[in-house]
């Protein structure tokens, strides 16, 4: 790109500072739906006891999500998004824009990094559940055939599927793996009642093999390795809908 066009360094001369902010995918998708150069939300920066607090509020007219993964849906996106501020870490990061005539312009130098996270709410929990359900759906779909299948299959003493199923039951201590979405629903339901669980209790609740259950837990939860809740599991911050309590070190 630089070989074909000119490079405008006005931003460097003006020493323009910019923020590099990571936002959730659904938020960027909602911004893209805004008409023209309309307002997408409000950014608030406040000082509390010498500490900078930043948050973004999405406009109400952009909060409605009508599709998830290309499938029709009806859910409201979280509107409140507090920022988690991060240092640049000694790096020199810059932001460029490119015009239709291949002209590059330096817009500014990154002076602050941040992550825009949704506040814990029922809307966010419902959105995450729909996203998990959509991602868990099988890619392969059944198809109706136009012609009658004439291939003859000979009867067998036992089908391969049943053999594999019985083998897995023995290997997993007679616990057969349930559908992933069903296990997720059981886990979310359990964590709505209590914030912390040890693995043994979750195995008793879900009736799932330990290895399989831990694979799913690692997607939505974290294991505490210290403090008064050592060796227990709790939901990751993005899946919680309760106020986090203080942890002991």
Swiss-Prot record:
Subcellular location: Nucleus
Keyword Cytoplasm annotated: no
UniProt cross-references to Pfam families, sorted A to Z: TFIIF_beta (PF02270), TFIIF_beta_N (PF17683)
Residues the record lists as N-acetylalanine modifications: 2
UniProt GO cellular component terms: microtubule cytoskeleton; nucleoplasm; nucleus; transcription factor TFIIF complex
Positions of modified residues (N6-acetyllysine): 22, 33, 137
Superkingdom of source: Eukaryota
Single GO MF annotation: RNA polymerase II general transcription initiation factor activity
Binding of DNA, residues: 227, 229
Physiological role: TFIIF is a general transcription initiation factor that binds to RNA polymerase II and helps to recruit it to the initiation complex in collaboration with TFIIB.
The protein's name in its UniProt record: General transcription factor IIF subunit 2
Naturally occurring in which organism (per UniProt): Homo sapiens (Human)
Gene: GTF2F2
């Amino acid at each position: 790109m630089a070989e074909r066009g000119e490079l405008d360094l006005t931003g460097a001369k003006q020493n323009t500072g910019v923020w590099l902010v990571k936002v959730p995918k659904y938020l960027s998708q909602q911004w893209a739906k805004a008409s023209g150069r309309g307002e997408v939300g409000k950014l608030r920066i406040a000082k509390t006891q010498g500490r900078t607090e930043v948050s973004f509020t999405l406009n109400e007219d952009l909060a409605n999500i009508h599709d998830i993964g290309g499938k029709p849906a009806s859910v409201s996106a979280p509107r409140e998004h507090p920022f988690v501020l991060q240092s640049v870490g000694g790096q020199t990061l810059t932001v460029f824009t490119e015009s239709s005539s291949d002209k590059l312009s330096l817009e500014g130098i990154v002076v602050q990094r941040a992550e825009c996270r949704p506040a814990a709410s029922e809307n966010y929990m419902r959105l995450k559940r729909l996203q998990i359900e959509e991602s868990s759906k099988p890619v392969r779909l059944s198809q109706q055939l136009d012609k009658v299948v004439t291939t003859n299959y000979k009867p067998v003493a036992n089908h391969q599927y049943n053999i594999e199923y019985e083998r897995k039951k023995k290997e997993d201590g007679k616990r057969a793996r349930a559908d992933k979405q069903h296990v997720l629903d059981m886990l979310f339901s359990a964590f709505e009642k209590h914030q912390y669980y040890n693995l043994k209790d979750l195995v008793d609740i879900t009736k799932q093999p330990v290895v399989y259950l831990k694979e799913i837990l690692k997607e939505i939860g974290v294991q505490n390795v210290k403090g008064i809740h050592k060796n227990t599991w709790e939901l990751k911050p993005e899946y919680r809908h309760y106020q986090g309590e203080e942890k002991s070190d």
